[in-house]
A protein has these predicted regions:
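Amphipathic, membrane-active segments
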Residues: 1-2
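Proteins synthesized as precursors that undergo proteolytic processing into mature forms
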Residues: 6-156
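Cofactor-centric catalytic regions
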Residues: 10-11, 138-187
Length: 187
């Protein structure tokens, strides 16, 4: 393992999936929202600015109200078969996280892909607006057909940052999205 090359640092959300030698496993997504969060530090920890996730239009489902928490798309996921964990998965990516995680789950559970192949599938989805398709992916070819059917389609970079681990005979196999920082490491 080596240091990351210099470049623009990602701000906001991080995710990791880890399994230890005993089989204890975690999928953890954490965020302080934007770089340095609220810019307020308490006892050495930066506080997040999660309140910016509220809809400030009165009466909306996610509008500000006393005792309410803002909607979050964080989706650290553990998949079980009976009592045994089969997979840990998650991603940064704001409101697109649910789309990213669902894509990888369908790839592994429904299509029989390994976790790396499922993570590498092109990204797509919606945030209650236009259909979003990953720019420069094989799904761009679908854009014209969707537009003909009345969809508004935007082709944009969608760099998920998915990280996952799946149980395989004799151990574990990891996957990390090559579109963003992250790596698989094991012994």
């Amino acid at each position: 393992m080596a240091l990351a090359p210099p470049g623009d640092a990602e701000a906001g959300t991080s995710h990791f999936s880890i399994v230890d030698a005993r089989g204890d496993i975690v999928a953890m997504t954490t965020t302080i929202e934007s770089a340095f969060g609220s810019r307020i530090m308490v006892r050495g920890f930066l506080l997040n600015n999660q309140l910016t996730d509220f809809d400030f239009a009165p009466g909306a489902a996610n509008s500000v109200a006393a005792g309410k928490r803002p909607r979050s798309s964080m989706s650290p996921t553990l998949v079980f078969q009976g009592e045994q964990v089969q997979m840990a998965l998650g991603s940064p990516g704001g409101s697109m996280i649910i789309n990213y995680v669902a894509k990888a789950l369908v790839g592994v559970l429904d299509w029989g892909l390994d976790v790396q192949a499922a993570i590498e599938l092109p990204n797509f989805g919606s945030r209650n607006g236009p259909t979003l398709i990953e720019q420069a992916s094989r799904y761009e070819a679908l854009s014209a057909a969707l537009v003909e059917r009345g969809h508004q389609v935007d082709r944009i970079p969608l760099t998920s940052g998915l990280h996952g681990i799946e149980r395989v005979p004799g151990g574990w196999r990891g996957g990390a999205d090559p579109r963003r920082e992250g790596a698989v490491r094991g012994e």
